Every structure is written in structure tokens, then in C-alpha cells.
């Protein structure tokens, strides 16, 4: 009985900040943690078409089919739900926003947005371009509207944007930044004041050039089901906006481990080819009524899920 009580007492005074699930390298260094770092991630994480990668621009090939995207519903203003999912800040998207074109095999509906960051200006992005990392990286995750086992390799289309620190406040990011203090603890939720996805993107003239490759989710189970679009031109946000992420968000309930370095290490490119856009045309960001048919397709697919 005394031994049992001693073990219970030990368990009480030394709680784990994580369950036995996956986590980032910085979390494994916490003596209270028992989670699995990137080297031990399960699922497909050891396969050979993983993400993120370093993009060597001199080795990319132009694909003339990589034209600018048509962004349907990206201009809709909504109050977006957000949460601290214990790994990042995640914004749930909906309402029929989707992307068309860019040599994608179908229409893809926007389902969520999340970010990766550090507290330094050059080590917070997951992808790197010619060996250069950025302060942050934003992923807008889209799901294929019609999907089957036969085409599972293109189940998701992710738009990845590098983010660097500048000297001007990015008004498009400000609604999200203002909401961060309300989701400090893991699993906490809140709502971003009315804004649009378009507000967070670079000007259309900065979205002509992007890179394309087939890869994986960058978190377990690391399924190799992603068509990656990585934009060359970074988004700029003010230093104070950037620092709000690591300042306000925490990995643990006790709020002792600030959320930062939520970045998977680079993965080997292997035999894959990275392509780049020719993109001579204009990016089309259209209001919902302008493209009625694709928009209704997005909405109906969302309703039927």
C-alpha cells in the first residue's frame, strides 16, 4: 500500500505537459514531456515524398500550365473561428471559398489556415528557398471536392506563404493577432473579428511566381496526399505582430512553454521534381457572384459532407 501511495504521489507532482502523442523538438526538451519528437513521428513520416523541403530555384523547371489561381470567395468577410490546437493557431474556414486553376485536377475547398513560426527572423518557416528560412510560414489547406482512393495523392492542395518581418503593420493580419491572447492555453477557442482571407494575402501582382511539387502533410501522420504551392514572394508583417504569436500562445496548460519553433525539419527531395510557374497572366480574385457555378459547387459539397 505504501508503495502504491508513493507512486501516486510521484505521478501527481510530476505531471506530463503532453500526452504520448507527437510534438515538436522544442517540446521534447521539456523534462515534463513524454511526447514523440519529429524523429519518432508515426504513420508515413518515414516515407520518401515528405514535406517540407528546401527549394533550389536553379533546379526548378518551368511548367506553363502553372497559371495564376482563381480564388473564389476569398473576399468574403467573416468572423472566423480559431483555436490553439496544442501545435499551432488554427483558423477554421468555410462558406464556400475555394481555388480553381493552377494546374490543379479539380476544385479545392478551403478548410483551414494555420501558421508555423519561431521567435527569430530566419528560422520559423518550414520550407526554405535556396537555403533561406523565413520568420513564419502560413498554410491555407484546401480539400479536393471529389476524392477517391484512386486519386488520394492529390487529396489536399496547400498554399504556402513565407512571412518576413517588416516595418509596417499588416492590417490584414491584425484581426488574427488581436485574437491570440484569448487562445493562450491548449484547446482554447475564440473568434477573429470580421475579415477576409484576401486581406491576409499579398497583392495579386506578388502572386504570379510560385513553386509546385507533390509532398505530404508536415504533421503526423504525414500522409503523402498534398499538392504543394509555395509562393516565392513573402508576406510582410510588423515585428510586434510577429512577436505576438510566441508571446501569447503556449504548448502547455501551465503556460510555461511558449509556442514557438513549431517547425518540422527539412525532408529529402529525393527523385521529385520541383516546378515553377510561368504565370504571365493576371491573378483573378473574384467576388462570389462572379463565378456562380464553381461557388455553388463548393457550397453544395460542403453541405453534403
From Swiss-Prot:
Active site location = 87 (proton donor/acceptor)
Propeptide cleavage-removed residue intervals: 278-305
Keyword Repeat present in the record's keywords: the answer is no
Q: Where in the cell is it found?
A: Cell membrane
Membrane topology per the entry is: Lipid-anchor; GPI-anchor
Lipid attachment residues per UniProt (GPI-anchor amidated serine): 277
**SMART domains attached here?**
Carb_anhydrase
One family from Pfam that matches here is Carb_anhydrase
Entry's EC annotation: 4.2.1.1
Q: Disulphide bridges in this chain?
A: 23-35, 45-222
Q: What are the boundaries of the signal sequence?
A: 1-17
Per UniProt, activity regulation is:
Inhibited by acetazolamide.
The chemistry this enzyme catalyses reads: hydrogencarbonate + H(+) = CO2 + H2O
Superkingdom is Eukaryota
The GO terms this record gives for MF are:
carbonate dehydratase activity; zinc ion binding
Q: Can you give the residue ranges of the Alpha-carbonic anhydrase domain?
A: 20-278
Q: Does the keyword Transferase apply?
A: no
Q: Which GO terms describe its biological process?
A: bicarbonate transport; carbon dioxide transport; regulation of pH
Function noted in UniProt: Catalyzes the reversible hydration of carbon dioxide into bicarbonate and protons and thus is essential to maintaining intracellular and extracellular pH. May stimulate the sodium/bicarbonate transporter activity of SLC4A4 that acts in pH homeostasis. It is essential for acid overload removal from the retina and retina epithelium, and acid release in the choriocapillaris in the choroid.
Q: Which family does it belong to?
A: Belongs to the alpha-carbonic anhydrase family.
Subunit structure, briefly? Interacts with SLC4A4.
**Name of the protein in its database record:** Carbonic anhydrase 4
**From which organism does this entry originate?**
Mus musculus
Amino acid at each position: 500500500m505504501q508503495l502504491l501511495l508513493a507512486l501516486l504521489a510521484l505521478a501527481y507532482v510530476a505531471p506530463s505537459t503532453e500526452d504520448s502523442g507527437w510534438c515538436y523538438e522544442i517540446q521534447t526538451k521539456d523534462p515534463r514531456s513524454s511526447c514523440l519528437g519529429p524523429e519518432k513521428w508515426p504513420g508515413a513520416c518515414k516515407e520518401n515524398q515528405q514535406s517540407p523541403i528546401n527549394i533550389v530555384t536553379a533546379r526548378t523547371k518551368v511548367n506553363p500550365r502553372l497559371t495564376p489561381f482563381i480564388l473564389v470567395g476569398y473576399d468574403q468577410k467573416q468572423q472566423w473561428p480559431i483555436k490553439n490546437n496544442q501545435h499551432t493557431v488554427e483558423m477554421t474556414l468555410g462558406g464556400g471559398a475555394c481555388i480553381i486553376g493552377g494546374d490543379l485536377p479539380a476544385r479545392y475547398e478551403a478548410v483551414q489556415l494555420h501558421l508555423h513560426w519561431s521567435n527569430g527572423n530566419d528560422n520559423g518557416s518550414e520550407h526554405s528557398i535556396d537555403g533561406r528560412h523565413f520568420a513564419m510560414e502560413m498554410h491555407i489547406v484546401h480539400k479536393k471536392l471529389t476524392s477517391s482512393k484512386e486519386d488520394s495523392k492529390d487529396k489536399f492542395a496547400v498554399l504556402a506563404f513565407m512571412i518576413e518581418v517588416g516595418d509596417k503593420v499588416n492590417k490584414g493580419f491584425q484581426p488574427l493577432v488581436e485574437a491570440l491572447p484569448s487562445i493562450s492555453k491548449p484547446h482554447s477557442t475564440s473568434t477573429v473579428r470580421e475579415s477576409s482571407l484576401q486581406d491576409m494575402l499579398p497583392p495579386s501582382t506578388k502572386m504570379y511566381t510560385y513553386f509546385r511539387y507533390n509532398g505530404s502533410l508536415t504533421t503526423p501522420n504525414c500522409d503523402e496526399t498534398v499538392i504543394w504551392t509555395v509562393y516565392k514572394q513573402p508576406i510582410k508583417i510588423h515585428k510586434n505582430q510577429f512577436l505576438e504569436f510566441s508571446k501569447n500562445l503556449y504548448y502547455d496548460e501551465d503556460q510555461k512553454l511558449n509556442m514557438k519553433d513549431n517547425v518540422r525539419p527539412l525532408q529529402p527531395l529525393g527523385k521529385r521534381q520541383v516546378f515553377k510557374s510561368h504565370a504571365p497572366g493576371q491573378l483573378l480574385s473574384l467576388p462570389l457572384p462572379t463565378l456562380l457555378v464553381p461557388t455553388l459547387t463548393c457550397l453544395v459539397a460542403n453541405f453534403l459532407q
